[in-house]
Swiss-Prot record:
One of its GO terms (molecular function) is structural constituent of ribosome. This is Small ribosomal subunit protein uS4. Keywords: Ribonucleoprotein, Ribosomal protein, RNA-binding, rRNA-binding. Belongs to the universal ribosomal protein uS4 family. It comes from the Bacteria. Residues 91-153 form the S4 RNA-binding domain.
């Protein structure tokens, strides 16, 4: 399944959750778009599981094949499958760039990585799905340090999560550790995703 490239606000309203984690998309109209959007039907158990999966997939901007592969990798780790799955999604390079405040959205962060503006431990990496390891340093390439998009994003960036650090002067940060579940979006129901794949 291809990656969704339409308006994030429209998809957020359809899924009933803020995919950008700002809450702005659904603050004024907390119902699905369209003529009958204000009347949500009661979902089946399968429908809830599917929606949880689609919500998580769209939030991190991952296509179906990548999503499935990350889910399987999470199943090989010790601990809770669903939580490990979210931790691996958080360790994607595009997401770490977003968490550090260098991009306003994960989609914008993915573009920065794709276009070669980002380095990992001093080496250029242009693969958004690159899995960042704890302790690795993420920085902006020297020739990209005056990039307006990055500067504008940093001006409005929220405080960084405790599992990343970022120096706005050097445009450099560290992925300190994998996050704890309590540090991530509490509206995500990752256990429903596990149930979806366990059918």
């Amino acid at each position: 399944m291809a990656r969704y490239t339409g308006p994030a606000w429209k998809l957020s309203r359809r899924l009933g959750i803020s995919l950008t984690e700002t809450g702005k998309e659904i603050a004024k109209r907390p119902y699905a778009p369209g003529q009958h959007g204000n009347s949500r039907r009661k979902m089946s158990e399968y429908g809830l599981q599917l929606q949880a999966k689609q919500t998580l997939r769209h939030m991190y901007g991952v296509n179906e094949r990548q999503f499935n592969r990350i889910f399987n990798d999470a199943g090989k780790m010790p601990g809770i499958h669903g939580e490990n799955f979210m931790f691996l999604l958080e360790a994607r390079l595009d997401n770490v760039v977003y968490r550090m405040g260098m991009a306003r959205t994960r989609r914008a962060a993915r573009q920065l990585v794709n276009h070669g503006h980002i380095q990992v431990d001093g080496a250029r990496v242009d693969i958004p799905s690159f899995r960042v390891k704890p302790g690795q340093t993420i920085s902006v390439r020297e020739k990209s340090k005056n990039f307006v998009v990055i500067k504008e994003a940093l001006e409005v960036a929220p405080a960084t999560k405790d599992f990343v650090t970022f120096d706005a002067e050097k445009l450099e940060g560290t992925f300190v550790r994998l996050p704890e579940r309590s540090e991530l979006n509490d509206q995500i129901q990752e256990q429903l995703v596990v149930e979806y794949y366990s059918r």
